[in-house]
Amino acid sequence: MAEGGAEGKAKRVLVAIDESESSHYALEWVLANLRSSLSSSPLVVFTVQPYSEISYLNAASFGAPPMELIQTVQQHHKELSLSLLEKAKEICIQHGVVAETISEVGDPKEAICEAVEKLKIDLLVVGSHGKGAIQRVFLGSVSNYCMHNAKCPVLVVKKSV
């Protein structure tokens, strides 16, 4: 996978992570199983800061939430994302893999697929959260959305029980 056909183009792999155990496992899986493929191109580790979800405060106060509260929530999401990426980068270094880290703000499903296209990713790797069928219907599934909408092959890594 490191060299692509006649062009000799390095393949780009993106691992989408969040704070879940399943995304951490997906990163570890890539580092253990695709390490030789990552020697000619940095691994892209990607996380998404969700939009601030403080709409419940609107109902309680019958107005807009204070700007300070919005900024505090946004700052918390930013710090969490940066911490996740820093830990992921350290794990990559321990495996001898160069990583490029990127954080975006938005809906995770859409942001991941947009990043795949923008960064010309050749393989997207996501973890499986193991939601049941009912949860997937009501909550949606990032991995399912990416499988149907990403402009590259998608590998869903599920931790064996």
Model-derived features: where do they sit?
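Glycine-rich, Arg-bearing micro-motifs that act as flexible, cationic patches
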Residues: 12, 123-148
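Generic structural signal for helix capping and beta-alpha/helix-loop junctions
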Residues: 52-53, 109-111, 133
